[in-house]
Amino acid sequence: MNAAAFDTHKFQVGRSDPRLAECLKEFPAATFNERLYQSMELMERYSIELAVDLLGQLNLAEQLGAWRSADELCSVLDFQPRFRLALQWILARLVESGCLQMRDDGATRSYRLRNTPWNPDLKYLRALGLNIDPANAATLDLLDYAASAYPAVATSRQNGDHNLFGPQGISLWLNYFHNDNLTYAINNWVGAAAAVDRLSSRPMLRVLEIGAGAGSATEILLMLLSERGLLSRLGRYVVTEPNAYFRRCNQRKLATQFLNLPLEWSAVDLDLPWSEQGIGSGEFDLVYAVNVMHISKNLLFSLNEARSALAADGWLVIGECVRPYDNQPIYPELMFQILDSFTDVETDPEFRPNPGFLTGEQWRRAFLKAGFTRTEVAPDIERIREIYPHFFTGAICGQNTAIAK
């Protein structure tokens, strides 16, 4: 791709491929529409613009006259080792834009300046994004805030968690995770639709939600259960969130919005034995989590803990930001990859080759490794990526058939 093709003021979003709507026809209408498609395209382009801006802020261009790997750049620029993953993302985005070229010898990826970067115009793209949907401000604000922390995280021992979860950051996260923000809410809609489809034939519903945050995923799941006439079957819904502030926000909102439901709130750390945190074996028909499992320190441990909590033939359903192809950079990573909780995980070459977001194939392998012999991914993200490679949402579903009678 030539960098000239990325002229900011020539950026336009056309209409989505009709085949994409066909792939999503079984999901609620709120899941996807043209406004969301245009918003997603805008966010991808905006994140590339931020990468070009960071190229200058981090003084990368002057070091890329010769081939350099991310590790070499970290060394020569005295960046902290923890910044390597974020730096790799910036470099990959710049390859997409035509500013850099990349070579891969099988062990190391190296980069070199190919074209002079353009002058980024974030204000112009931001105005376009707000014109598409004023609610896009939530994602744009968080992208800007996260990018502004990159230089400090790169050059100091202060981690991204400290920068992004301070007083200003918390309000931005709450806005981002809100269901009014369609670019995030799609994760909640896809996860909830997949979960409800797998619960609809059960006479009694016992639900455990892990990492519920401020409750946007819980809200959509309860709404869909209500629309399908299933709330009367809800025998128990345990909403867990380790962050006390988010948990209080969750409880205040949902206890008022959904009266007379058997909702419970507690704290569960997915990296510690669940049985020691009040979660009994075989107690639930559904274990549910949206954009949580990818931060598990030991993914197989957490998946096995989830399976242990399930009744015979119960389902684990996780809504996840899914990477369409191996090594494909995607815009949501900009907000998360300077967080230690996102990057400080145990990797595995078979099913978790990198921290953060995984592909559908990698999730399937992880579920199978954890004993979920019946594993499904919805929608058909392998088909969708051939039509639209910027669709990043999927629900990975595994049934506890190993102990089913």
Sequence positions of predicted segments:
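Class I SAM-dependent methyltransferase SAM/SAH-binding core
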Residues: 206-208, 212-273
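C-terminal alpha-helical "lid/dimerization" subdomain adjacent to the S-adenosyl-L-methionine
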Residues: 319-370, 374-380
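A short SAM/SAH-binding and catalytic strip from SAM-dependent methyltransferases
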Residues: 284-300
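A short acidic, Gly/Pro-enriched loop at the edge of an enzyme's catalytic core
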Residues: 274-287
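Local beta-strand N-terminus motif with an aromatic residue
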Residues: 204, 234, 283-285
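N-terminal accessory segments
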Residues: 1-182, 188-206, 371-377, 381-384, ...
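A short glycine-rich, Lys/Arg-flanked "PGG" loop and its adjoining helix->strand segment in the class I
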Residues: 300-315
